[in-house]
């Protein structure tokens, strides 16, 4: 397929999850409706991952595409109908007998994802070493956490040009080269093993507390394997604490098998969140999630959340923007050359600020223009003018004077306060 056809096929999937309720805003949101180029709901401004949208198939396609043309193709399966790669995530179901007074019932726990290891006991140990609120048990807080991290750490628009907004043919080509490069140089999947199992296949030198390393025996020396096994200590590359004997550890092949992590320590070095499904990116001796690895390589537009492959873009408020996406967060009007106000790190045009965000003057009860001086005390504000910031009793101007605040009113003296009480 040539680049022109790829550009024509691009779309943001606006029908997906339409009308789904927001789990964060509840009844304040009318239902999910994807903004035409931002990756948020038009109604409540929350992301799709904050809404009750069933995304399992879509997420499996996204991760499947990420692993396509990599050494991790064993983790995907191509659908016979359309050849789309699907992520074969490992689902683990544990059954535990529960003793009751008269009979024994079975308690079943389903993990929406588990490390793909043959030893289920090892997988169970791994799960138990994660914080309870991050264990991906179906229907739990942990499953919702995993869903959010899949969306946050591995955005589809960081790997698939068809998920981006109006890329040029040149930008599509550059993005494809970028994705190919990070797949070959940085992408990896963690491996869960017992540290002692790695002695045979990994390097002889392993980390021990204090930063020291064990050394291989001198030539001709007799090796006492049992003594070596007992004396070898392993420490976590992240927290530097020792690993307990018999506890599972995570290895990252790109980091080398002389590094290992506690399950709860296998996190992104920027956001410090668990690396979802142990999918990592390795750069400069650090672990990254997909999002923050890409951020370390390319500027990201604060408007559409996509990586910027254009030669021309703008910088404002310590953020990067596509030229066409430096817009008012409320009405989408272009802000180049216009007055704007930052509200929660989002630029808002002056009319929208006055209409939706401006504080109201306690004196005249009108919105306070962002360019006008004001007086603020606690949660109350006034125009800094002789018409508004006045004693609530005698109307004396209080600019530059001492005053007594009482529930939104201000007084110039105790006498005036008593007269109004």
UniProtKB/Swiss-Prot annotation:
Main location: cytoplasm
A biological-process GO annotation: negative regulation of cell population proliferation
Domain PET intervals: 92-199
Keyword Zinc: yes
Amino acid composition bias (Basic and acidic residues), ranges on this chain: 155-164
Keywords: Cell junction, Cytoplasm, LIM domain, Metal-binding, Repeat, Zinc
GO cellular component: cytoplasm; focal adhesion
Domain LIM zinc-binding: 234-297, 299-359, 362-421
Entry's localization field: Cytoplasm; Cell junction, Focal adhesion
SUPFAM superfamilies tied to this protein: Glucocorticoid receptor-like (DNA-binding domain)
Gene3D superfamilies: Cysteine Rich Protein
Region annotated Disordered, chain positions: 133-164
One GO MF term: zinc ion binding
Comment text on domains: The N-terminal and the C-terminal halves of the protein can associate with each other, thereby hindering interactions with ZYX.
Function: Scaffold protein that may play a role in cell adhesion, cell spreading and in the reorganization of the actin cytoskeleton. Plays a role in the regulation of cell proliferation. May act as a tumor suppressor.
Family per record: Belongs to the prickle / espinas / testin family.
Subunit description: Interacts via LIM domain 1 with ZYX. Interacts (via LIM domain 3) with ENAH and VASP. Interacts with ALKBH4, talin, actin, alpha-actinin, GRIP1 and PXN. Interacts (via LIM domain 2) with ACTL7A (via N-terminus). Heterodimer with ACTL7A; the heterodimer interacts with ENAH to form a heterotrimer.
Name the UniProt record assigns to this protein: Testin
Gene it is expressed from: TES
